Amino acid sequence: MISDQPHRLVEGLEGRFKDLEIEFHRAYWDSQVEATPESEGRRAELELELRRIKGDPDALAAVEGALQDDIHEPVLKRQLEVLRLSLLDNQMQEPQRELLVELSSAVESDFASFRPELEGRTVSDNEIDEILRSSNDPDLRRSAWEASKEVGALVAGRVRELARVRNEMARDLGYPDYYRMSLDLQEMPEEWLFDVMERLEQLTEEPFRDWKSDLDRRLRERFSTQQLYPWHYADPFFQQTPPDGRVSLDDALQNVSASELCSKTFGSWGIDLGSVLDASDLFPRDRKCQHAFCLNVDRDGDVRILANVVPGERWVEVMLHESGHAAYDISIDPKLPYLLRRPAHIFVTEAIAIISGRLIRDPEWLTKVAGLGSSEIGAIEADIRSAKAAHSLMFARWVLVMVHFERDLYADPEADLDARWWELVERMQLVTAPPGRSSPDWAAKIHTAVAPVYYHNYLLGEMLASQLEATCARECGGLVGMKEAGTLLAERVFAPGNLMTWSVLIEEATGSSLSPDDFVTGLLTSAS
């Protein structure tokens, strides 16, 4: 029986799913480090059981009833608010629940195990990335780019079906579609969000167009062609800064240990990543997920990073990014209740990861932490700062593609999504679609299927990262090697966990509400 007393209600519900949630996280980890029918089956079984428990309508009714009372304990009230959001996200009919878990598990398994063929042999994502970064053979580049999209055709049907099931669930709860429901459950006002997206589109359009025009000029010379297509760029989705001939750190970082650099970076901020790195799985192999993520298994110190590190700039940046997530997770006040021992919001932890990842293009970090020569970095410092701005511009325009596409996907899963994808790519990224291309390239991005309504958090994270950097510069004199900056982030951002809403946390941490001003100012200053 569900208690109607708020304290006992919270304790009882937490007790019902805490251990199962931890067990599910362990099974999820196992399914990603080695995708087998057994590991996938175990993960799906636990996810279904967890969703059933959280889908209890009586539990939701009890929590909503408790929130109607005049609760004077902020911690208790916040726990009830967090419970409500989690329970509401799982209210669905049993056939919907079973189909949702079946489809999402199958798609994740496909992404973890699928390897396309190129020139008669199986290749990994890392090998495709290397071709697009370095090859001067247009035919090989085209074949590699097309191979990177093959997984999209494999999963597209199931991704559409996932959108239909999610929409059915959302409409049963009174929402127009799953996209709007998800924003509500993320405590994210839709009108405010798209006002920000529109403003960022306008503010970045001219500088991005100017930067890309210069890049395209050099690429046309490099490939001896007047018409550029997606495979001429250095990333399957044109979301990573290309080594454009002026600055690349691949050679300089060829022989460094990414994990050691992360340990040194966060150690200078007073954060010990030793236990995280010891528990992590960092190098590529067959049947392992080819992407990267950080997983907080138990909200009690068991935090792990999955990566596929190979030498060079990209994976050092990825490891810094994921280590930012890990530093946040292990620094949350352990005395907080289990329900509140998580980041204040998805985009707040993304902001910390982005701050960390940006260090790869910080001349001070490259010399003081990575140990590169001052004269070596000094000679390319201006280019490094320009590359930092280019990365922010490129990534902002890429996120705009994903944000608008996802909203359209859930508005109408039956639409011509293949065409809509390329409309957005051409508008936001100024990349020309291949002639006659008619393939579900949108489904080749793993987030579309398994991390729905997530991508806007990256751009909000960019904004908050810049705002926090400005705060650290103002109050601590900077970030690199500054223990005071680590203390500021730990005390104001990490330790509170999810004790308050993201808007309140940002006001308290930076002294102002979330704004794109520092982000736009930073990229325009670096680009000039």
Segments the model singles out, each with a brief description of its role:
Residues M1-L154, V453:
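N-terminal helix-rich structural modules
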Residues M197-E206, P343-A379:
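Post-HExxH zinc-binding segment in Zn-dependent metallohydrolases
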Residues A144-V151, L183, E190, T241-D251, ...:
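Glycine- and acidic
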Residues M1-P6, P37-E40, E81-V82, D177-R180, ...:
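C-terminal, non-catalytic "cap/extension" segments appended to globular domains
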Residues S39-L50, G55-A59, L183, E187, ...:
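Extended, well-ordered alpha-helical scaffold/bundle regions in very large, multi-domain proteins
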Residues P311-I330, E350-I354:
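Active-site recognition of the HExxH zinc-binding catalytic motif
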Residues D281-Q290, L340-E350:
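Beta-rich nucleic-acid/ligand-interaction surfaces
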Residues E119-E130, S134, E146, R160-L306, ...:
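Active-site-proximal, well-structured secondary-structure segments within enzyme catalytic domains
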